[in-house]
C-alpha cells in the first residue's frame, strides 16, 4: 500500500519559466492569432474605467490582438477613445442624455436589463449607468437576448430620442443592441491549438487568461486556481472556498466571464434564485452558468424553505415549486472568509464554521463536490498579475461554456477503480471534479493515464476535505473517509490524505503531568466534545475550587460530586494519603468549544486521585463514562461517536465502563481495534486502571 497525495511539480525552475514566458507568448500568437491580448493593457484600462474585464478585453480583442507594437499602440488609442466617448460614466449621465436628445441617436456602452411592463404591454430597458429606467425595447431584441431579462448584460447600444406631446411612453428607445460577447466559437480551433502546448504550459495559458502570472505561483496553488474554474465547464457543480481575505476568491466569478453572476452576501429569495411563482419565471439558476455567493456568513433566505430547495437543487439539478418540477444547469459556488487560523479551526471546530447557522447541516454540506483550501493561496500582490499575453477573457469564457456540453466523467474507469470508502455521493463528486479538470486541461480529450491520476488525486483530496468536516459534524455516519483508488493494471491501492488533517495532537504523546485527565463526553448542547482537566494542589485544609465553567451551576455540581466521592472513599484508593492536608483547584478546558458538560464526575475523581498520589494517568488515555455520588457507573452515550472523536484527537487508550460493553457491536471493528481498552466496574476500579495500578 502507498500513500499518494503529492501533486506533480513540473521539473522547470522559475528562471526557465521566465524565459519560457516569451516562448509561450510566441506560441499563443502563433496558434491563437487574433484571440490573445496583452494583459497589462487590460490592467492599464481597468484602473481608469469601472467596467468588467471581459468588456475591456472584447474591445482590446477587436483593436489590439497583435504582437506588433505599432498596431497595439494604435488600437489602444482607439479603445481609449471609445471608452471616453461611448462608455457612460454615472456622473456624466445627464450630459449623455442631453447628447442623445440633441443628436436624435447616440451609441453607448452600458449594462442593460429589461423588464416587461404589463400595464402598457411593452418591454422597458434599464440602463444602469445612464440612469434611464424605461427605454423602449423591440420585442425581437428581447427574444434574441434572453439574458436581458435576468440580471442584464453589457452591450453596445444605439439609443434613439423621439418625443411628441401627450405620449405615454418614454422618449428613449433602443435601436440596435450588440452584446459584448463572442458571436461564435469554433471548438476545433481550440482542440488543434491545444496540441502544441504541454500540460504545464496549458495550465499557464489558462492562468494568464484570467490575469494571473504563473511564473510566480507555486504548482499546488496553480491547481487551486484552476479548480476555481471548474464550475464554468461542469453543469451543476457545487464548490466552496473559504480562506483569508484578499486571496482573489471572487475575482474569477465577477470579472472573467459574462456567464457568471456574483451574488453578494445578504438576503436572497427563492423567487429570485430559483422560481418566481407569480410571474412563472425561472430564477438565476436557469439563466446563468455559475451563481457564486460572496461572503457566505451573510447569506439569509427570506423564505423558510430556501435552504431546503437549495439542497434539492444541489443534489439533482432540479427542484419543485407548486406543481412544476424545474431544472437548472447553474453551478453553485460559495465563497467566504475564515477569521481564525486553520490550525485552530481544524483542532477545535470544523472548517465549515463560517457558514450561517441555518446552513450548518450535514445534508447540505454533503452536496458539495469540492472544498478548495483558500488558506493555501497567497494574498494577491502585484507580481501575481501578468503583463504577458493570454486568451481574451470572453473567448476563454465561451470555450468554457462550450465544454459544458461534453462529459469526461468516464475517464477514471479506463485506468483506475475507486476504493470502498467512497459512497455514491463521493463517487459523483470525484467524477465531476476529474471531468472538470480534464475539460480545462485536455479539452481535446487527449489525456494519458498519468494526467488522469493527477486529477483523480486532487479530486479525492478536495472531496475528502468536505467529508472530514461532515465527520466532525455528523459523527459516525460519515466514518469512511480513507479515500483510495486502485490501479487497474498493477492492482496497487493508493490512499489520498488531506494536508491539514489536524486535531490528532490534542492529546499529546508522552506521559502527562499528574492531575491531567482527558475525557470525551456529551455537552449540555448535545454535541460530543473533548475536555481536559488540569489540577493543582497546594498546602491547605481540604477545600476545593473549580474554574473554566463560567456560571454553569449544573456543570460545577457534577465536579462537586466527584470531589465528594474522592473525600469519602479516599481510604479505598490509598490508606496513606491524607485528604485534609491540601487544597485542590481543578480547571476545565473545552478543547472542542462544545460548552460545559454535566457528565464529568468520574474524570474529576481520577484527576484528584492522580494529583494527590503524584501518579500520572496512562499515556494518551481518554476517560469515558460518568458516575453518581453513590458510585453507580453511567454508560457512555453514543459510544461509536465518542470513540471516533477520541481517535481523531490522538487517543491510544480508552477507559470504558463495563455497562457499555453491550454497545461495542455498534462500533466499526477497524475503529475499535485502534485502542487499548481497559474496562472498569466501579469508580475505584476506574482510578486504578487509569493510573496503571494493578
Swiss-Prot record:
Sequence intervals crossing the membrane: none
Top-level taxon: Bacteria
Xref: SUPFAM superfamilies: P-loop containing nucleoside triphosphate hydrolases (SSF52540), Ribosomal protein S5 domain 2-like (SSF54211)
GO function terms (MF aspect): ATP binding; ATP-dependent peptidase activity; serine-type endopeptidase activity
Any one Gene Ontology BP term: defense response to virus
Assigned keywords, A-Z: Antiviral defense, Hydrolase, Protease
Positions of disulphide bridges: none
Phenotype seen when the gene is deleted: Methylation of 5'-GGTAAG-3' in chromosomal DNA, however BREX no longer confers phage resistance.
InterPro entries named among the record's database cross-references: BrxL (IPR013473), BrxL-like (IPR014061), BrxL_N (IPR046838), Lon_proteolytic (IPR008269), Lon_Prtase (IPR027065), P-loop_NTPase (IPR027417), Ribosomal_Su5_D2-typ_SF (IPR020568), Ribsml_uS5_D2-typ_fold_subgr (IPR014721)
Factors inducing expression: Transcribed at similar levels in lag and exponential phase, rises in stationary phase.
Hydrolase as UniProt keyword: yes
Role according to the record: BREX systems (bacteriophage exclusion) provide immunity against bacteriophage. Part of a type 1 BREX system which protects against dsDNA phage. This system allows phage adsorption but prevents phage DNA replication, without degradation of the phage DNA. Methylation of bacterial DNA by PglX guides self/non-self discrimination.
Family classification: Belongs to the BrxL family.
Name of the protein in question: Lon-like protease BrxL
Source organism of the structure: Escherichia coli O9:H4 (strain HS)
Gene name, Swiss-Prot/TrEMBL: brxL
Amino acid at each position: 500500500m502507498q500513500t499518494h497525495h503529492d501533486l506533480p511539480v513540473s521539473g522547470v525552475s522559475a528562471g526557465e519559466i521566465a524565459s519560457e514566458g516569451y516562448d509561450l507568448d510566441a506560441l499563443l500568437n502563433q496558434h491563437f492569432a487574433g484571440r490573445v491580448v496583452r494583459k497589462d493593457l487590460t490592467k492599464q484600462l481597468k484602473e481608469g474605467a469601472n467596467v468588467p474585464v471581459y468588456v475591456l478585453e472584447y474591445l482590446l480583442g477587436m483593436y489590439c490582438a497583435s504582437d506588433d507594437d505599432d498596431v497595439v499602440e494604435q488600437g489602444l488609442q482607439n479603445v481609449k477613445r471609445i471608452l471616453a466617448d461611448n462608455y457612460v460614466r454615472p456622473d456624466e449621465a445627464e450630459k449623455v442624455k442631453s447628447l442623445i436628445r440633441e443628436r436624435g441617436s447616440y451609441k453607448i456602452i452600458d449594462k442593460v436589463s429589461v423588464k416587461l411592463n404589463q400595464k402598457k404591454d411593452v418591454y422597458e430597458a434599464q440602463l444602469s449607468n445612464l440612469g434611464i429606467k424605461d427605454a423602449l425595447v423591440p420585442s425581437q431584441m428581447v427574444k434574441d437576448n434572453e439574458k436581458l431579462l435576468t440580471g442584464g448584460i453589457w452591450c453596445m447600444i444605439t439609443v434613439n430620442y423621439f418625443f411628441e406631446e401627450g405620449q405615454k411612453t418614454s422618449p428613449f428607445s433602443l435601436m440596435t443592441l450588440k452584446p459584448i460577447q463572442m458571436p461564435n466559437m469554433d471548438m476545433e480551433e481550440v482542440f488543434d491549438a491545444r496540441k502544441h502546448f504541454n500540460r504545464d504550459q496549458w495550465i499557464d495559458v489558462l492562468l494568464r487568461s484570467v490575469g494571473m502570472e504563473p511564473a510566480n505561483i507555486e504548482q499546488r496553488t496553480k491547481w487551486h486556481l484552476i479548480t476555481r474554474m471548474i464550475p464554468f465547464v461542469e453543469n451543476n457543480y457545487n464548490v466552496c472556498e473559504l480562506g483569508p481575505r484578499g486571496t482573489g476568491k471572487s475575482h474569477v466569478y465577477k470579472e472573467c466571464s459574462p456567464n457568471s453572476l456574483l451574488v453578494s452576501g445578504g438576503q436572497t429569495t427563492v423567487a429570485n434564485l430559483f422560481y418566481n411563482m407569480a410571474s412563472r419565471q425561472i430564477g438565476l439558476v436557469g439563466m446563468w452558468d455559475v451563481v457564486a455567493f460572496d461572503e457566505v456568513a451573510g447569506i439569509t433566505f427570506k423564505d423558510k424553505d430556501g435552504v431546503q430547495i437549495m439542497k434539492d437543487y444541489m443534489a439533482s439539478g432540479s427542484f419543485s415549486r407548486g406543481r412544476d418540477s424545474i431544472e437548472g444547469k447553474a453551478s453553485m459556488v460559495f465563497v467566504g472568509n475564515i477569521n481564525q487560523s486553520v490550525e485552530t479551526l481544524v483542532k477545535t471546530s470544523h472548517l465549515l464554521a463560517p457558514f450561517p447557522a441555518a446552513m450548518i447541516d450535514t445534508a447540505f454540506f454533503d452536496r458539495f463536490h469540492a472544498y478548495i483550501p483558500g488558506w493555501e493561496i497567497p494574498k494577491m500582490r502585484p507580481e501575481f498579475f501578468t503583463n504577458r499575453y493570454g486568451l481574451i477573457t470572453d473567448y476563454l469564457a465561451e470555450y468554457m461554456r462550450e465544454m459544458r456540453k461534453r462529459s469526461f466523467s468516464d475517464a477514471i474507469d479506463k485506468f483506475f477503480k475507486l476504493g470502498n470508502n467512497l459512497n455514491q455521493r463521493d463517487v459523483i463528486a470525484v467524477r465531476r471534479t476529474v471531468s472538470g479538470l480534464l475539460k480545462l486541461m485536455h479539452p481535446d480529450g487527449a489525456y494519458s493515464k498519468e494526467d488522469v491520476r493527477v486529477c483523480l488525486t486532487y479530486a479525492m483530496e478536495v472531496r475528502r476535505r468536505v467529508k472530514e468536516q461532515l465527520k466532525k459534524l455528523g459523527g459516525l455516519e460519515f466514518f469512511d473517509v480513507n479515500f483510495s483508488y486502485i490501479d487497474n493494471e498493477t492492482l496497487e491501492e493508493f490512499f489520498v490524505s488531506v494536508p491539514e488533517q489536524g486535531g490528532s495532537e490534542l492529546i499529546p504523546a508522552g506521559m502527562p503531568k499528574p492531575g491531567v485527565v482527558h475525557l470525551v463526553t456529551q455537552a449540555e448542547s448535545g454535541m460530543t466534545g473533548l475536555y481536559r482537566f488540569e489540577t493543582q494542589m497546594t498546602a491547605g485544609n481540604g477545600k476545593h475550587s473549580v474554574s473554566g465553567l463560567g456560571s454553569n451551576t449544573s456543570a460545577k455540581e457534577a465536579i462537586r460530586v466527584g470531589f465528594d466521592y474522592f473525600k469519602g472513599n479516599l481510604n479505598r484508593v490509598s490508606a496513606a494519603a491524607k485528604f485534609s492536608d491540601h487544597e485542590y483547584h481543578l480547571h476545565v478546558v473545552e478543547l472542542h468549544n462544545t460548552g460545559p458538560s454535566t457528565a464529568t464526575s468520574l474524570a474529576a475523581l481520577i484527576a484528584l486521585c492522580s494529583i494527590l498520589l503524584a501518579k500520572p494517568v496512562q499515556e494518551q488515555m481518554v476517560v469515558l463514562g460518568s458516575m453518581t455520588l453513590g458510585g453507580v457507573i453511567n454508560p457512555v452515550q453514543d459510544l461509536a461517536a465518542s470513540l471516533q472523536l477520541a481517535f481523531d484527537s490522538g487517543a491510544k487508550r480508552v477507559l470504558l465502563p463495563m455497562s457499555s460493553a453491550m454497545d461495542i457491536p455498534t462500533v466499526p471493528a477497524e475503529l475499535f481495534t485502534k485502542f487499548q481498552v481497559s474496562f472498569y466496574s466501579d469508580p475505584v476500579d476506574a482510578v486504578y486502571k487509569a493510573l496503571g495500578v494493578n
